[in-house]
A protein has these predicted regions:
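Short, surface-exposed acidic
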Residues: 29-40, 78-89, 170
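Asp-based, Mg2+/Mn2+-dependent phosphohydrolase catalytic module
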Residues: 1-5, 107, 119, 123-124, ...
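Alpha-helical elements of Rossmann-like donor-binding domains used by nucleotide-donor carbohydrate transfer enzymes
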Residues: 22, 42, 69-73, 88, ...
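Hydrophobic alpha-helical core bundles mediating ligand binding, dimerization, or RNAP-core interactions
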Residues: 20-27, 43-47, 67, 89-93, ...
Length: 226
């Protein structure tokens, strides 16, 4: 059966919309009140697009740089020029809220006697800071970063990091992600996969389908106890 459970970080354990949502809630920047969902969505989509384009063009840069670049694009798209807003959004992104189902899912892995680890596009400094701020480090055995291979998901070298770190076969790893394309790529690599389909999106038309599809991370506990 499983020997380790790997979790994606951004969008799976950490809420990527939280920076924009939390800043909007302060009313410090009134223009964000209605705009923040669109800003957060474009910021995230550009962030991911930049990972794919940089991987394809062999131009790796730390995920933090791509996060900043994506925010600059999104702000310009919405005619937002306030540098204080930019600084505030990035400060909040360093310390994203954990989803409410993140801690229970990690607790379930711990109670099953398995190591839980993160496998993320995030660079190591980002991950260390984010998970300390989220209060989840006590349940995480390791934080595995693509920084070690200089390429982003869905490159197979990223998923190989999990096998190398724990000296296990791919099929002995359960991988959990809220990104359908990430779950598909991990499955193609050989992991058993759970797609936490938070947004109720259609299944990606890719060569591999997730082994399990659930609306939240609550399924992790159910699956490990079955």
């Amino acid at each position: 059966m499983y020997k380790v459970v790997l979790f994606d970080a951004y969008g799976t354990l950490l809420d990527v919309d939280a920076a924009a949502a939390n800043l909007a809630a302060t009313n410090r920047f009134p223009e964000l009140a209605k705009l923040w969902p669109e800003l957060a969505s474009l910021w995230r989509s550009r962030q991911l697009n930049y990972t794919w384009l940089r991987s394809l063009s062999h131009r790796y840069a730390p995920f933090w740089q791509l996060t900043c670049d994506a925010l600059d694009y999104a702000m310009e798209a919405f005619d937002l020029e306030d540098q204080d807003m930019r600084t505030a959004l990035l400060d909040l992104y360093r310390e994203l809220d954990a989803y409410q189902d993140a801690r229970p899912a990690l607790d379930a892995v711990y109670e099953a006697g398995l190591p839980a680890a993160v496998l993320s596009n995030g660079n190591q400094q980002m991950l260390n800071h984010a998970f300390a701020a989220a209060g989840l480090t006590d349940r995480l055995d390791s934080l595995l970063s693509v920084e070690d291979v200089g390429v982003f998901k869905p490159d197979p070298r990223v998923y190989q990091l999990g096998c190398d770190r724990y000296q296990v076969r791919a099929e002995e790893i359960l991988f959990v992600s809220s990104n359908g394309w990430d779950a598909a790529a991990a499955g193609l690599f050989g992991f058993k996969t759970i797609w936490a389909n938070r947004a109720g999106m259609p299944v990606e038309r890719l060569p591999e389908y997730p082994d399990f599809i659930a609306p939240s991370l609550d399924f992790v506990a159910e699956h490990l106890s079955s």
